[in-house]
Amino acid sequence: MSRTPIIAGNWKLNMNPKETVEFVNAVKDQLPDPSKVESVICAPAVDLDALLKAAEGSNLHVGAENCYWENSGAFTGETSPAVLKEMGVQYVIIGHSERRDYFHETDEDINKKAKAIFANGLTPILCCGESLEIREAGKEKEWVVSQIKADLEGLTSEQVSKLVIAYEPIWAIGTGKTASSDQAEEMCKTIRETVKDLYNEETAENVRIQYGGSVKPANIKELMAKPNIDGGLVGGASLVPDSYLALVNYQD
């Protein structure tokens, strides 16, 4: 089973529409063929329109950084997955550690979002990962497995086959500590085994698993050489055209 690698930039709360267009213009002619590597940028909601228009006709795929689990209604400040689909967005990040931590999103919330995203024909990029405290207590696998089980509750094997899961060790984000490629591979393997236990081998072989935790041009090749790592969810390095291009063109 050969899984198409997927490198997704997560811009977080950075970039305005003008900078977005400048970024796309700088990268769009140098992106790999999507059958070789899928290049994605997940941008703030206020930049999505500019991003989609600028990326039109290129190999750049567009993702949102969040959405709500209802398509419409009295939910001030939320983003509709149905409207994201209508706009041409393909991916939505859910369960990011910043959403879990700062906005107190629970696995139940994330599960509802996953169902709504699939119901609207979009693909979730589901984040999971442990804190330093949990890692130091030796409970990281237990923690991540419990997240995956709760987040995938009620999803079909057909849906999970299309899913992207991003492992982000929270302790390796902005702490100066880095997960080694072996540590990253070990957890990505555990995630794949968990999907196999919950569903079946075929589903586990289809699901694409990214590593997210200080991914940069200097370590992308080493990470992508690992059998269970199918891509990267990239923060800071995705904001600069040159480093983003170095990441998506890591095979060259």
From Swiss-Prot:
Entry's Gene Ontology molecular function annotations: triose-phosphate isomerase activity
Q: What are the protein's UniProt keywords? A: Cytoplasm, Gluconeogenesis, Glycolysis, Isomerase
The record, for SUPFAM superfamilies, names: Triosephosphate isomerase (TIM)
Q: Name one GO cellular component term.
A: cytosol
Q: What is its EC number?
A: 5.3.1.1
Residues at the active site: H96, E168
Q: Which residues bind substrate?
A: N10, W11, K12, G174, S214, G235, G236
Q: Where does this polypeptide localize?
A: Cytoplasm
> How would you classify this enzyme at the top EC level?
isomerase
Q: In which pathway does it act?
A: Carbohydrate biosynthesis; gluconeogenesis; Carbohydrate degradation; glycolysis; D-glyceraldehyde 3-phosphate from glycerone phosphate: step 1/1
Q: Which reaction does it catalyse?
A: D-glyceraldehyde 3-phosphate = dihydroxyacetone phosphate
What does the entry give for GO biological process? gluconeogenesis; glyceraldehyde-3-phosphate biosynthetic process; glycerol catabolic process; glycolytic process
Q: Which Pfam families match?
A: TIM
State the NCBIfam families in the record: tim (TIGR00419)
Q: Which family does it belong to?
A: Belongs to the triosephosphate isomerase family.
Oligomer and partners: Homodimer.
- Biological role: Seems to be capable of enhancing bacteriocin synthesis. Involved in the gluconeogenesis. Catalyzes stereospecifically the conversion of dihydroxyacetone phosphate (DHAP) to D-glyceraldehyde-3-phosphate (G3P).
Q: HAMAP family annotated for this entry? A: TIM_B
**This chain belongs to which protein, by name?**
Triosephosphate isomerase
Species this protein is from = Lactobacillus delbrueckii subsp. lactis
Q: What is the lineage of its organism?
A: Bacteria, Bacillati, Bacillota, Bacilli, Lactobacillales
Gene expressing this chain: tpiA
